[in-house]
């Protein structure tokens, strides 16, 4: 039995999962549910562009709206390569220049080992899950 599909439409097979959007959780926090490459690179690129614009606006004195902090949900990330690590560092730097914070959460043991080996555990803030990360972000913004 063939699956139902509209006439003239072929089945679409995806090699990779669809890119997960970056969700605006509140006026001050956005949550990125990251996947493996190539989605990881696309999402990190989107965050980098956002924070670059915010940093440029801040530098030029045009910071009308408050820059959103970011929670990077890495629950679906199964590996990190050197390019991914460079993207994490770039987003962190740009967020800092824009006056925002970045928090990583839901890290698997395998990814945690990579973060420890590269000393990124000393640079980033971490939370166990998204809910804890959001609570920590709200407390940080409250100061």
Give short role names for the model-derived ranges.
Residues 12-55, 74-76:
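STAS-typified acidic loop motif
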Residues 69-71, 79, 83-131, 135, ...:
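Amphipathic, Lys/Arg-enriched alpha-helical "gate/interface" segment within cytosolic domains
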Residues 60, 65-75:
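A structural preference for short, pocket-lining loop segments at secondary-structure junctions
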Residues 52-59, 63, 93-96, 138:
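Residue-level signal for alpha-helix termini/capping positions
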